[in-house]
Regions:
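Residue-level signature of mid-helix packing/kink "hotspots" within the transmembrane helices
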Residues: 31, 59-67
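Juxtamembrane helix-start elements in MFS-like secondary transporters
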Residues: 47-51, 55
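Extracytoplasmic
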Residues: 14-48, 69
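Conserved MFS/SLC helix-loop-helix module at the cytosolic interface between two early adjacent transmembrane helices
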Residues: 64-103
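Helical-face signature of the major facilitator-like transporter fold
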Residues: 19-27, 59, 93, 101-114
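Structural signature of transmembrane alpha-helices in multi-pass secondary transporters
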Residues: 55-58, 62, 114, 143-150
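Conserved glycine-rich helix-kink/hinge and helix-boundary motifs of the Major Facilitator Superfamily
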Residues: 20, 52, 83, 137, ...
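Cytoplasmic helix-loop-helix junction between adjacent transmembrane helices
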Residues: 108-147
Length: 150
């Protein structure tokens, strides 16, 4: 029996609801960037290669950091990792609006935002698994709907 088994009855669903909202914001952040990218491209005078580079660096940086996020998620408080990553990528997203050139956009969007989001996933899914033993598949399926709504 873990400490997660001793929480009050509905708490695991409250945790799921909060993680659902966080995941919704995570996916909305990714999708809205694609929507505004033509405006950013025009405003900053970016080429097709530059726009593709931003997406490539985001994906590469994210892919490199996800295992590190999992490693850290196994050793430190997952709830604080989720909290810190949401705050970090939210602030990075806010500062993305202040970018005035390609390099700054790569740093803010790809490295800062992608880096923050990379630490979210492993801790997020681990928390769901911790709180939902017999309802794990159902909880994961509910959580996954945030991907499609976001």
């Amino acid at each position: 029996m873990t400490g997660y088994d001793k929480v009050r009855k509905g708490y695991k669903w409250e945790v799921l609801a909060l993680l659902w909202v966080a995941y919704l914001l995570n996916q909305a952040d990714r999708q809205v960037f694609n929507v505004v990218l033509p405006l950013i491209r025009e405003d900053l005078g970016l080429s097709d290669v530059a726009v593709g580079t931003i997406a490539t660096v985001f994906n590469l940086f994210y892919a490199m950091l996800v295992p590190i996020g999992g490693f850290i998620g196994d050793r430190f408080s997952r709830k604080w990792i989720v909290t810190a990553s949401v705050l970090f990528w939210s602030i990075a997203t806010m500062f993305t609006g202040l970018c005035n050139g390609f390099l700054m956009l790569v740093v803010m969007r790809s490295i800062a935002t992608g880096g923050g989001e990379a630490f979210f996933g492993p801790a997020n899914y681990s928390l769901i698994a911790d709180y939902h033993d017999r309802t794990r598949a159902f909880a994961m399926s509910i959580h996954q709907t945030a991907y499609y709504v976001g």
